């Protein structure tokens, strides 16, 4: 595999293991030329799924968009890249299990919100503010109150 740092094709696998959900193989690699290490993920090729946008347009499903959105929401939060990768894998698995060749952006958003709520509540509020298009401070307060109620319900 080509090194992303120096472009050399001389790399070797140091460690290889399945992801927690078993949908991918995570490989830790080292470049023999520059000595830098990097991680790759090997996944099986899936049947194409189309995302139905709010305006009715359709585009090919792109797991990277989900991952990048979650990375942005988790910026400066104690959430690892691996945790985000596993969450994206769970979202993709749920979508596959639903078995549809088309999925609305609303459904993807719901799944992302569920995963973020479990990972980090601050990241959840960040994404909710964009996803639900918050316009007023009261909308932030309401979602924080909702999280507090859920937490109190779990403690009882």
From Swiss-Prot:
The UniProt record lists the keyword Kinase: no
Alphabetically ordered keywords of this record: ATP-binding, DNA-binding, Metal-binding, Nucleotide-binding, Repressor, Transcription, Transcription regulation, Zinc, Zinc-finger
PROSITE patterns from the UniProt entry: ATP_CONE
Cofactor entry: Zn(2+)
Gene Ontology terms, MF aspect: ATP binding; double-stranded DNA binding; zinc ion binding
Protein name, per record: Transcriptional repressor NrdR
Coiled coil region boundaries: none
Zn finger (unnamed) location: 3-34
Pfam families the UniProt entry points to: ATP-cone, Zn_ribbon_NrdR
GO biological process entries: negative regulation of DNA-templated transcription
UniProt cross-references to InterPro entries, sorted A to Z: ATP-cone_dom, NrdR-like_N, RNR_NrdR-like
Reported function: Negatively regulates transcription of bacterial ribonucleotide reductase nrd genes and operons by binding to NrdR-boxes.
Family: Belongs to the NrdR family.
Segments forming domain ATP-cone: 49-139
Cofactor: binding comment: Binds 1 zinc ion.
Keyword DNA-binding: yes
């Amino acid at each position: 595999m080509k090194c992303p740092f120096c472009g050399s094709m001389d790399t070797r696998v140091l460690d290889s293991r399945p992801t927690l959900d078993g949908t991918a193989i995570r490989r830790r690699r080292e470049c023999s030329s520059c000595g830098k290490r990097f991680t790759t993920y090997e996944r099986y090729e899936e049947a194409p799924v189309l995302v139905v946008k709010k305006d009715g347009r359709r585009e090919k499903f792109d797991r990277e968009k989900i991952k990048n959105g979650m990375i942005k929401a988790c910026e400066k939060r104690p959430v690892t890249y691996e945790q985000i990768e596993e969450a994206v894998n769970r979202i993709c698995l749920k979508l596959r299990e639903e078995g549809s060749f088309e999925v609305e952006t609303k459904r993807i958003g719901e799944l992302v919100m569920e995963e973020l709520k479990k990972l980090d509540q601050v990241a959840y509020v960040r994404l909710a503010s964009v996803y639900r298009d918050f316009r007023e401070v009261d909308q932030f307060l309401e979602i924080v109150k909702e999280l507090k109620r859920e937490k109190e319900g779990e403690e009882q």
